[in-house]
Amino acid sequence: MRDESEDARSARLLAPVREALARFEQETTVPVLAGPWLGEVGFELLYWIPFLRWVVSEFPGLRRQLVIQSRGGVESWYEGLVTRYVDLFTHVTLREFRERFGKFFKQTDTYDGYTQAAGGRDYSEAEQAIIEIVRREVGAERLNVLHPSVMYGAFKHIQGSPERAFAAYFPELTRPPVSGFGLELPEQFIAVRFYECFPLPASEANQAFVRELVTVLADTLPIVCLNTPMSIDRKHPDFPIDRIESVVTVQQSMTLANNLAVQSAIIGQANAFVGSYGGLSYLPPLYRRPSFSLYSDGRSLSKTNHLALAQSVLGKPKLGSYWVGSIEGMTPRAVADAVLAS
């Protein structure tokens, strides 16, 4: 295969995936579970959902068969894909989730290592439990399973498609309505969520920077803090935000089953989003909202393709702006000026 072209190699490596998807499409009466999905928000927005959009573009019949499973009320993220959506958080408590499914949060730093073929795996006990929850909810005798491991193995080859074609898998989303959550939002505001992660550790210096940044921003526009009342992912606790004037909290409107739905609705209405570099920062551009995310430790960013991919597709003219910067050598005032000028 020494002389094999990149296109030929991608086609060869995608062949088992296509064969499995074609089999699923032929079984028209059997629902296809897209999942079990319990990965991080960033992987869902940047990889999983675009992969599913590729799937239905290549196999249109699967659109009618897909059953989307996720958590936190993110059905709107799958706009144009979903006819049936099952939210795990309507079936389990937070304690049950941690005890039974917490290990699902572990992700790889890069999707290059995943080569699992469709239909070729034994499911863990936790995965089997989720598959059974979905099967019962949709009332099916059995499900075909489109497992995320298929996406990790195939995505790098899908990403090799022409840039314009690949960007089509990141369409503009309809901004979700804020009605129904009991929210009282300012007419104009900035949505803020900072949480601990590898790029932005919760050091004293970083927390001080964030506190000053929020204070400076709040002098001009109200701040809506997206911190959640429950610690769903203990690896990424929220930075505390001072309860100062012009800072609005929305924890009273959040439940386990709707926390991401609430955050999505608020981000869609915000003048801008400001937060840690990571998963949630990928969402605002899909609503044509500017996103500003910060990091202090760039070492983790250099090990993956995530940032390069986000910058290449989320800053497209049809979407909102996507800005990522290091707080090293910057001042809170400089960041605030950039946000307020957007």
Task: Give names to the regions the model predicted.
Residues 71, 187, 192-197, 208-259:
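Catalytic donor nucleotide-activated moiety binding site of glycosyltransferases and closely related
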Residues 281-342:
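Nucleotide-sugar donor-binding patch of glycosyltransferase catalytic domains
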Residues 30-33, 189, 272:
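Structural motif
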Residues 78-95, 237-254, 289-291, 308-326:
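Active-site regions of enzymes building and remodeling cell-envelope glycoconjugates
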Residues 1-20:
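Membrane-proximal basic amphipathic "stem/tether" segments
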Residues 268-274:
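Acidic donor-binding loop of glycosyltransferase active sites
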Residues 113-195:
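A nucleotide-sugar donor-handling region in carbohydrate enzymes
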Residues 18-24, 30-136, 262-265, 280-283, ...:
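Active-site and donor-binding regions of nucleotide-sugar-utilizing enzymes
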